[in-house]
């Protein structure tokens, strides 16, 4: 018996216009909220019951792992969607593409029917696209279109049905495939070419005779999109023509654990569970009006506390392929975390940072330095027209390097001219990362750079080795630089408009970076031999991330039941092992999906080796492409057929994704790219740089912002050149100097420049509208919501808890992190000055302790401890923690990590010195001493 969740006969009864309007409203609401949700909530510190028992990592209960559904559905925050987010951001670049204004008769070559059948498992998804085209032209045509092909997807099969003949595509080297295509066209025959071109899938249907129909079958193999504990499958609206056509979609999900929920916005699908176990489900959609919205299937499986494995067997070559899927969660107090990590802070020291921005940044850096633990490595990089570094390479964190960092920070000034960020980032990321110390980079900047897209493309290629956090300072910062760089490397970002809260916002991201991590992950394959693992280097598993590993075995294993060991460095700096049981006797023989995806991931490793190590892996890539039928940078699919009648007429070239006179600007309207007619010899409608969207658009939205009396009427417009100041400060490891910076423009000239710029660009608002809705600044004041709702805190490695709606509505879009209600059992006191707090924090040693002599000018340290067995530095550190709680409650975000490190030191000393009192008892005594 089938279990039906929803049954909707055929497609939705709503008109296409109604759907578009609803989609616009949904997308606008969604964009206004997703930035607020993109940073995980702060995590409460769990208490240790006994001071004499070392903390341990344990799995958390299933009841604590489920995220709020609105966060699970927030696909904009998912890493896999960053590719499409970038396309959406830059889709208006195509307004300047050649041939935009060329008119194509829409009924010459049309898509009549589009069917997609997808097979989803826990590790991969394979989709077969069947597209039926009709050529009503009186002359032969060459049809050309390109669709986005995400970097985690590839074409793995290709065939054509022409005149009732099924023509199977063959993988060839790119050059040979193109030669064969051109030869077939020149001889009057038909040809079909499928290839991957710089991030897009390009399909050419050549020399299709008049009045002939053709059916194209394409198989796309892809990794599963993941977000929090959910699995996503996205069919972006940009892949569909804007015309009406019949569309049928079937998704067959077969998971290893029961399915808890299936969600799909914009559509009312039929969802059928095959049995009561709910491990298998079928989702179907049908419509006669084409597709104008994203199709995103969101499946939430039941949480599994252990790695899951999936095995395939290929009887053709007697090989096995397997996938390992793991979403770990640990329960460990933040003051107990002692994991290794590398922290690199990159600070903008251009002239425009002079004054309060650079001073506040230096204060924030001082706090960051005291928040690191002794298992860290770190470095500081200052950049402008050139850059310099604290150390040539990152150094281990100790009292000596901490002192050098403080001296270096004290010398920092806004004296480095312009804003050239690419060079220092390349210098950082080109150095081989240490898997023992996961690399995390923090960038603080207030400007914009000329090579933004090149930078985003570059850092995106390093996402497996590095996580990047970004801070945008001030009103003139390039927001897409801040958002794009962080999302490309699976990091987070903050927009800092008001310098007064800079330290708080900087520490929010530092707190995220400190959350428990599983790093230096390796698989011990044991008795298995000739294992090809991909990716070869496994990315560290940060909070709320899922790991996917693939492997192929060309030989039969000697044993049918094998246990391999997945291991990594845990949050307590210990080595943690997870056994993974493999039963080869139960291998699936009906599909080759994991074989294909494993080969694709291996090809990606080889291509990355070509990029970084300059190796020539073309022969290996071509061999894998031919064996598994994969399109790559070196391989394409080709189909040729001799025509019954040689075509001698002139062939017309048309775009399948045909242009339209009316430019839809809603992000939910399915407008996407503005396609154009392809004429012989013209360049592609799509950009041709390594990044699908490189190159700044000459069109910029300058929609007027809301008019609060204190804000400039031009704050949303493109800024004039940044202001510079000139001064000299000694800096170690100076890079090559740059020419002198230009003189600073006056504020009046800046405002006039903005006014002139916006006057020239008002046309863009009507052209683009909501396409760049994420760029619109909703000038909501950052006020304390009244009354704010408390958040229910969760343990480390648990997904974000729900954020109250009132908090979301009160937040500014310039801040992407959720508003957190501070919890304290003590009443709030008037805060002492921020400078006083910074001076206290500066006295902390690398191990987290404070000495009596260093803090005697800030607090009364002469109060004796409650017992004589308490060492002086332990009691002094307790007094400082109590002082933070009692006198700096309103600045908790600044000292919270400093206090956690101090707490960790005290707890370690309690165990080491066999002190009878618990930490909580001693802290209460310290509070009483501070209060007296």
UniProtKB/Swiss-Prot annotation:
Disulfide-linked positions: none
InterPro entries given in the database record: VIT, VWF_A, vWFA_dom_sf
Compositional bias (Polar residues): 677-686
Biased composition (Low complexity): 815-834
Location of the region described as Disordered in the Swiss-Prot/TrEMBL record: 1-49, 661-752, 800-834
UniProt domain VWFA: residue ranges: 342-521
PROSITE patterns xref list: VIT, VWFA
Compositionally biased intervals (Basic and acidic residues): 15-39
VIT domain mapped to chain residues: 95-222
SUPFAM superfamilies listed in its UniProt record: vWA-like
Any matching Pfam family: VWA_3
Transmembrane segments: none
Name assigned to this protein: von Willebrand factor A domain-containing protein DDB_G0292028
Lineage, broadest ranks: Eukaryota, Amoebozoa, Evosea, Eumycetozoa, Dictyostelia
